[in-house]
Amino acid sequence: MGSDLVSIIMPSYNCGKYVEETIHSVLAQTYQNWEIIFMDDCSTDDTIKKVSALRDKDNRIHVYQNIANLGAAVSRNNALREARGRWIAFLDSDDLWESTKLEKQIRFMEENEYFFSYTDYQEIDNESKAKGVFISGPEHITKQGMYNFCWPGCLTVMYDASKIGLIQIEDIKKNNDYAMWLKICKKADCYLLDECLARYRRGRAGSVSSHSITTMIRWHYKLWHDAEGKGALSSLWLTGMNLIYGFYKKQKYVKKAEK
């Protein structure tokens, strides 16, 4: 396996409660050639203070701050422009990785000559306790498959920037990770490493998982209409497909551990 640099894109807003735990999950990786591109969106809590203290101990952590509160899409775009690595990975500042995540995913991609991949993950609560919910997805996602639904969890995705290039997305407030996968899937199919290598914090105030279905429908429509430039009817159709495949995903790929 090679030893190319991994750039970890970490946007943040008011995650002071969790950010140290998140970064420690990166520090614990068995694959150590990485950099964190930490992009703070003008947090009003102690996020910057905590991350700066960690940066002072490890120069692989690069801390940036937007000039104003600009949202996750702009934060990811800004962070990606600072990335130097061949491999691009994503980790929000309240989620966690298992210690072998980078090593196993890079090996999976190199051995199979994949340029875009994701892994299984599990849900945790606000106290980092496992909820017993595990999420997987299709083994192979084509461009059309990605149009059907946003299968990958953002915290599990990795792509090869030497093949894909710099990705920049439209300034939409939600579903900006989905907008990114749609752009990447126009250049490379996405493949699943069928192993649980990440932990997603579900239900934090302000997170997507805490919003109503009506709100999420509106976000999906804006994704297709504003970010992908589809007409009104096409945007409605694709939003409907997202709803159908979202139900399908819950039935097929979301599993609850037996108590």
Features from the language model and the residues they span:
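Cell-envelope/extracellular polymer assembly enzymes that use nucleotide-activated donors
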Residues: 4-7, 25, 35, 179
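Short, well-formed alpha-helical segments that are part of the catalytic scaffolds
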Residues: 14-28
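Acidic helix N-cap motif at the loop->helix transition within catalytic regions
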Residues: 17-20, 45-53, 96, 100
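Glycine-rich, basic loop-to-helix element that forms the pyrophosphate-binding segment
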Residues: 66-83, 104
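Conserved nucleotide-sugar donor-binding catalytic segment
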Residues: 81, 137-215, 219-220
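Short aromatic/hydrophobic "clamp" motif used to bind/position activated sugar donors
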Residues: 88
